[in-house]
Amino acid sequence: MAFKVRNAKTLNTMANSWLGKMQIALEYALNRSGPMSMAPSQLGAFARSDAAQTSANIQYHVQPLSLNKFGEPLHPFPAFTASVCNLRPTARGHVRIASSDAAQAPKITSNYLSTEEDRQVAADALRLTRRIVAAPAMQRYEPEEFLPGPTFQTDAELAHAAGNIGTTIFHPVGTCKMGRDDDATAVLDPQLRVRGVVGLRVVDGSVMPLITSGNPNSPIIMIADKAAGLILADRKRAVGSGAAGSANA
């Protein structure tokens, strides 16, 4: 969601001219400070989309800027964006081979908002954002919603708006699931080995059966550390077996 504001500087106005861009670049070059020294999101938060949730199921990234979509210019008025993502989506997409040419990109279908549960979370999250922005502490900035806009009110309208203005958060997982031997949907065994292939493991976010409720960077580092231990243990056993065989021979 995006809101126009007053009585505040945002990157929209600071970087919407060549002079502004030069001032930002100069501040960073001389002092290593200013907008170029900051992460795009200045605020992050975890929240529950509704009272029935037992733990946080949505995550906020708030940026002091606004634009229609990635790659387009910033809006010419001061504004901020409150991006909210569903941490536990129920929709499932797929990745499929496009042809026998290994160099050709696969066909990726995300299926965002394809389940009723995800559409409800989207609608509830937008309503929660409106309540937060309507809090007394925010009123000095006179926030005015313009994306998607106050005319969207019903669950269906809000879910549709989320689909129109939403984008990926770049955390795809689960395309190469790890699982038990009796799980027909698991491509990998519990040791991260590709079933039916000798000497091949997969070690990245694709092995997660379900995404974790937050940024996957740390869990993937942990998976890599665990995989290193598995590989070293297998290597040690193999070397031990070879040494024992030689001695017996």
Regions found by a protein language model. Name each.
Residues 1-76, 131-136, 153-156, 160, ...:
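Mid-to-C-terminal "cap/lid" subdomains and adjacent gly/pro-rich loops that border
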Residues 2, 46, 96, 177, ...:
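Structured core elements
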Residues 8, 52, 65-67, 87-89, ...:
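Short, glycine-/Ser/Thr-/acidic-enriched flexible segments
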Residues 40, 117-124, 128, 153, ...:
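Generic recognition of stable, solvent-exposed alpha-helical segments in well-folded globular domains
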Residues 44-50, 58, 63-70, 77-144:
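C-terminal segments that line or cap access tunnels to active or ligand-binding sites in enzymes
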Residues 59-69, 76-83, 136-211, 217, ...:
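A glycine-rich dinucleotide-binding beta-alpha-beta segment and adjacent secondary-structure elements
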Residues 93-95, 105-108, 187-189, 210-214:
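Cytochrome P450 core scaffold surrounding the K-helix E-X-X-R motif
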Residues 211-231:
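A conserved FAD-binding loop/helix module that cradles the flavin
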